[in-house]
């Protein structure tokens, strides 16, 4: 019983002994803001620019995006290898033509192939 009375007394003292906000704090803050305003005005600082609030933070936290299916692997086409053969022959014929034209102009075929490889690396 004595312990309960003692604890209630200590709790009461702790509540009433807590520091309170000083009186007139808002008035002091307003006076300091006016003083700052007058100092900025004397120094030539653009006060109107200071009064405008900074740009609002556009990051509003995590916003889920629409689900994209780009992560899914591409399905292999069921194209028959026979249909690719004419395309490969046409490409080989064009390459042979370019190499022959290069030889007629005095360019080494290895240089032409190296140039084509270099161009294809950056694409």
From Swiss-Prot:
It comes from Caenorhabditis elegans. It is found in: Secreted; Cytoplasmic vesicle. Disruption phenotype: Defecation defects including a distended intestinal lumen, a strong defect in intestinal content expulsion and reduced anterior body wall contraction. GO terms for biological process: neuropeptide signaling pathway; positive regulation of defecation. Residues 30-31, 66-67, 75-76 form a propeptide. Residues 1-17 form the signal peptide. GO terms for cellular component: cytoplasmic vesicle; extracellular space. Expressed in intestinal cells. Keywords: Cleavage on pair of basic residues, Cytoplasmic vesicle, Neuropeptide, Secreted, Signal. This is Neuropeptide-like peptides nlp-40. Disulfide bonds: none annotated.
